[in-house]
């Protein structure tokens, strides 16, 4: 190899970082010496009262379990001064306080049910509701022919606003509406002015036996699953609604009798009309197609 080639190679090798000795390399790392808890320029990292505070907190009984549905604005809730105490201070204010069961299957706890209710009527009339002082009067229609009334009642049966009433009344109207005379149509018109949940329970509930509790009761399904997961008792299927008696104005109603027969005929379990068939009731699985009434 000629001298002219060796000189450039030696120059490149000396300029390479690998050729720099290890002793001349500079490290850019940094390290900090951690002081002990009670050492250092800023003093101790934990306050001097920490052991005493820890001993004070561990000696107290645990705070009561407070579900997210328990209101702190009730009269029996412990107070700290003028305002209600936060949940973490309950064991200091009243160690023996136990919050009442917030639910028995109703939502009255959120809507003022803790307050003392006033005098209630034994039976609410048409257009009356619990907790209101006014009366919702239904619309009065005059000069309506039978065909128009059937079409309107079919619409009102299908558009109730809740799924249970939609399925119940739409299937009922599909079977019976075309067969009703003018007097039955007028009675059915007045019946649809009732509260949707009242109609649903009047048609689906049987008279209770003696000793049955007159309030909503949690189901076994909720006790196995929802009670452990913190699920509300208002969830669908979590409670069995209390029996709602039929008011005297509908006790002898032909429309209500037909509606209850319609429920029994379509029931999948437990009703006599379904047992008399070779196969059980088909249920109320879907809303039927719209009928067109010629007369």
From Swiss-Prot:
<comment type="subunit">
    <text>Interacts with the flavoprotein subunit within the SDH catalytic dimer.</text>
</comment>
<protein>
    <recommendedName>
        <fullName>Succinate dehydrogenase assembly factor 2, mitochondrial</fullName>
    </recommendedName>
</protein>
<feature type="compositionally biased region" description="Polar residues">
    <location>
        <begin position="45"/>
        <end position="75"/>
    </location>
</feature>
<dbReference type="Pfam" id="PF03937">
    <property type="entry name" value="Sdh5"/>
</dbReference>
<dbReference type="InterPro" id="IPR028882">
    <property type="entry name" value="SDHAF2"/>
</dbReference>
<keyword id="KW-0143">Chaperone</keyword>
<dbReference type="GO" id="GO:0018293">
    <property type="term" value="P:protein-FAD linkage"/>
</dbReference>
<comment type="function">
    <text>Plays an essential role in the assembly of succinate dehydrogenase (SDH), an enzyme complex (also referred to as respiratory complex II) that is a component of both the tricarboxylic acid (TCA) cycle and the mitochondrial electron transport chain, and which couples the oxidation of succinate to fumarate with the reduction of ubiquinone (coenzyme Q) to ubiquinol. Required for flavinylation (covalent attachment of FAD) of the flavoprotein subunit of the SDH catalytic dimer.</text>
</comment>
<dbReference type="InterPro" id="IPR005631">
    <property type="entry name" value="SDH"/>
</dbReference>
<dbReference type="InterPro" id="IPR036714">
    <property type="entry name" value="SDH_sf"/>
</dbReference>
<feature type="region of interest" description="Disordered">
    <location>
        <begin position="35"/>
        <end position="90"/>
    </location>
</feature>
<dbReference type="GO" id="GO:0005759">
    <property type="term" value="C:mitochondrial matrix"/>
</dbReference>
<dbReference type="GO" id="GO:0006099">
    <property type="term" value="P:tricarboxylic acid cycle"/>
</dbReference>
<keyword id="KW-0496">Mitochondrion</keyword>
<dbReference type="GO" id="GO:0034553">
    <property type="term" value="P:mitochondrial respiratory chain complex II assembly"/>
</dbReference>
<dbReference type="GO" id="GO:0006121">
    <property type="term" value="P:mitochondrial electron transport, succinate to ubiquinone"/>
</dbReference>
<comment type="similarity">
    <text>Belongs to the SDHAF2 family.</text>
</comment>
<feature type="region of interest" description="Disordered">
    <location>
        <begin position="269"/>
        <end position="295"/>
    </location>
</feature>
<feature type="region of interest" description="Disordered">
    <location>
        <begin position="208"/>
        <end position="227"/>
    </location>
</feature>
């Amino acid at each position: 190899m000629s001298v002219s080639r060796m000189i450039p190679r030696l120059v490149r090798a000396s300029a390479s970082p690998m050729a720099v000795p290890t002793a001349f390399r500079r490290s850019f790392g940094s390290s900090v010496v951690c002081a002990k808890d009670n050492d250092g320029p800023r003093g101790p990292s934990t306050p001097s009262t920490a052991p005493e505070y820890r001993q004070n907190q561990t000696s107290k009984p645990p705070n009561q379990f407070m579900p997210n549905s328990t209101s702190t604005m009730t009269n029996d809730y412990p107070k700290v001064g003028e305002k209600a105490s936060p949940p973490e201070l309950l064991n200091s204010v009243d160690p023996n306080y136990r919050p009442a069961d917030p639910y028995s299957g109703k939502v009255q706890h959120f809507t003022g049910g803790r307050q003392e209710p006033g005098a209630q009527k034994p039976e609410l009339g048409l257009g009356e509701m619990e907790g209101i002082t006014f009366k919702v009067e239904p619309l009065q229609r005059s000069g309506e022919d039978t065909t128009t009334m059937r079409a309107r009642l079919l619409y009102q049966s299908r558009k109730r606003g809740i799924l249970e009433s939609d399925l119940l009344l739409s299937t009922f109207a599909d079977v019976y509406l075309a067969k009703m005379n003018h007097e039955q149509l007028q009675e059915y018109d007045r019946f649809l002015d009732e509260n949707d949940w009242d109609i649903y329970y009047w048609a689906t509930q049987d008279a209770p036996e003696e000793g049955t509790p007159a309030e909503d009761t949690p189901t076994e399904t909720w006790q196995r699953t929802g009670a452990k997961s913190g699920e509300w008792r208002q969830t669908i299927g979590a409670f069995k609604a209390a029996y709602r008696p039929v008011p005297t104005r509908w006790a002898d109603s032909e429309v209500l009798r037909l509606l209850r027969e319609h429920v029994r005929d379509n029931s999948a379990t437990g009703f006599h009309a379904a047992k008399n068939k070779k196969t059980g009731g088909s249920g109320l699985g879907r809303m039927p197609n719209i009928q067109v009434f010629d007369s």
